[in-house]
Swiss-Prot record:
GO terms classed as biological process: translation
Signal peptide stretch: none
Residue spans crossing the bilayer: none
The keyword rRNA-binding appears for this protein: yes
InterPro entries: Rbsml_uS13_C, Ribosomal_uS13, Ribosomal_uS13-like_H2TH, Ribosomal_uS13_bac-type, Ribosomal_uS13_CS
Name of the protein in its database record: Small ribosomal subunit protein uS13
Family recorded in the similarity comment: Belongs to the universal ribosomal protein uS13 family.
Keywords from the UniProt entry: Ribonucleoprotein, Ribosomal protein, RNA-binding, rRNA-binding, tRNA-binding
Length: 122
């Protein structure tokens, strides 16, 4: 079983798909990594040689921000927005959508379950 960036990749899947189990790597980035490392995309994880795994691991370490580093960067960006006090930061602070979606009727994912207000009947 190949272990890259602290993640155990599933053995039975193609390496192109298996790399997407790493946080921060999707299909297109996975294909880019494999092309740069010179590894066939249709190879199964358990058929990879140690040299191929090393090439993939080195490319990811050198060129791609994944897992903990990426999570930390994202949370620091959100924290920076909140500290600035800009509109997006305020929306993050209040737990509301920050990209212009309507909130009168929808946005239940960000706002949480609906709380009934007494005396709000028409």
């Amino acid at each position: 079983m190949a272990r890259i960036a602290g993640v155990d990749l599933p053995r039975n899947k193609r390496i192109e798909i298996a790399l997407t189990y790493i946080y921060g790597i999707g299909r297109s980035l996975s294909q880019e990594i494999l092309t740069a490392a010179g590894v066939d995309m249709n190879t199964r994880c358990d058929n990879l040689t140690e040299a191929e795994v090393t090439k993939i691991r080195e490319y990811i370490d050198k060129n791609v921000k994944v897992e903990g580093d990426l999570r930390r960067d994202i949370s620091m960006s959100i924290k920076r927005l909140m500290d600035l006090g800009c509109y997006r930061g305020l929306r993050h602070r209040k737990g509301l959508p920050c990209r212009g979606q309507r909130t009168k009727t929808n946005a239940r994912t960000r706002k949480g379950p609906a709380r009934t207000v007494a005396g709000k009947k028409k």
